[in-house]
């Protein structure tokens, strides 16, 4: 089976490509022109350069593929409002979906985000039945991902789009070249995390999400969403787990919500005045003390998503960052 993977050089995309190769599939990786694709070096794949916002280039890349796994996304959170976020997270999805229908591709696995559903407390974590509630934070990343998901589900109902949607939570793993979640690990390792907030989130191994995406080519139902979450930890627990896994001291100070919000307000103001991304914006300050917990029951039961122990995912991420020069030696 030949499968087109968008965002193939990103953290999740790099895991998806390797998972597909392990299963014996042919992979065509669609990457942006001129982009560093070092995470794909040495892999037996077909690389195609193309602009996802150009429908003809997308169709050309999709020719002769039986399935598409769309992992590319703009995860920018500053500025919190930016048309470029919508271009990647909504316009591109519309172009891909149209090409899937025109070329009669068998399966379109779209990677969304768990935040398209309302989270819950640990005792009652969010599920695929929950409404979208994160619009209150004013982040185009979350709003655009939810809007794209709604569009795809409408297209499935009205036009028979063969789409299955995967909704990952916060991912740890190798190939985190930005780094994204790896920044949290680097900060704890270097002792740069002064404290933690009262909220929490769901952490998952990127390799598990990749396995679920690959499984979705054969398993699961069209027009369904699957939350690919993992372990639900408050921030104190998460930082202690990272510190224990790496053998360093955990941050011990719990920062009050009012102080976090004040820091976020100052950060947003500084960001607007300086044009530089702040350490903490007001929307992210509000997110940081929310309980963002999710259930992975549906993805585990229907897609057979594995459940890697979180320390293993943390170590995998840290070791990759270390091997690639991101870790400051103590």
Identify the role of each PLM range.
Residues 3-23:
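N-terminal Rossmann NAD(P)H-binding glycine-rich loop of SDR-like oxidoreductase domains
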Residues 34-41, 45-91, 99:
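NAD(P)H-binding glycine-rich loop region in Rossmannoid oxidoreductase-like domains
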Residues 77, 114-124, 171-178:
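Conserved catalytic-site region of short-chain dehydrogenase/reductase
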Residues 88, 94-140:
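Conserved Rossmann-fold NAD(P)-dependent oxidoreductase catalytic core, especially the SDR/UDP-sugar
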Residues 137-164:
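Active-site Tyr-X1-5-Lys
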Residues 147, 179-180, 197-217, 223-224:
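Substrate-positioning beta->alpha
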Residues 158-165, 169-203:
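NAD(P)-dependent short-chain dehydrogenase/reductase
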Residues 212-279, 296, 301, 309-330:
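Mid/C-terminal beta-alpha module of Rossmann-like enzyme folds, strongest
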């Amino acid at each position: 089976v030949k499968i087109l993977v968008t965002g193939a050089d990103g953290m999740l995309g790099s895991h998806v490509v390797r998972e597909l190769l392990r299963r014996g599939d042919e992979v065509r990786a669609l990457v942006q022109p001129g982009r560093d694709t070092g995470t794909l070096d040495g892999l037996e794949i077909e690389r195609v350069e193309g602009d996802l916002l150009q429908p003809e280039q997308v169709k050309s890349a999709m020719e002769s593929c039986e399935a598409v796994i769309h992992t590319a996304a703009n995860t920018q959170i500053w500025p919190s409002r930016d048309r470029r976020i919508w271009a990647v997270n909504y316009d591109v999805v519309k172009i891909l979906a149209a090409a899937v229908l025109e070329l009669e591709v068998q399966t379109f696995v779209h990677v969304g985000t768990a935040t398209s559903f309302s989270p819950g407390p640990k005792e009652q974590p969010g599920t695929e039945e929950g409404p979208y509630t994160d619009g209150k934070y004013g982040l185009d990343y979350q709003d655009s991902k939810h809007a794209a998901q709604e569009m795809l589900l409408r297209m499935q109902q009205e036009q028979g789009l063969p789409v299955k949607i995967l909704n990952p939570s916060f991912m740890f793993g190798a190939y985190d070249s930005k780094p994204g979640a790896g920044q949290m690990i680097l900060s704890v390792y270097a002792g740069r995390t002064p404290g933690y907030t009262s909220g929490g989130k769901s952490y998952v191994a990127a390799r598990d999400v990749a396995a679920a995406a690959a499984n979705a080519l054969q398993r699961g139902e069209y027009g369904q969403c699957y939350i690919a979450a993992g372990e639900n930890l408050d921030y104190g627990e998460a930082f202690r787990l990272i510190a224990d896994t790496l053998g360093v001291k955990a941050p011990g100070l719990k920062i009050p919500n009012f102080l976090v919000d004040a820091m976020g307000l100052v950060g947003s103001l500084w960001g607007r005045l300086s044009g530089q991304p702040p350490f903490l914006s007001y929307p992210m300050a509000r997110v940081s003390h929310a309980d963002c917990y999710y259930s992975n029951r549906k993805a585990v039961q229907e897609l057979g998503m594995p459940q890697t122990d979180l320390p293993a995912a943390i170590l995998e991420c840290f070791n990759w960052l270390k091997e690639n020069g991101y870790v400051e030696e103590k």
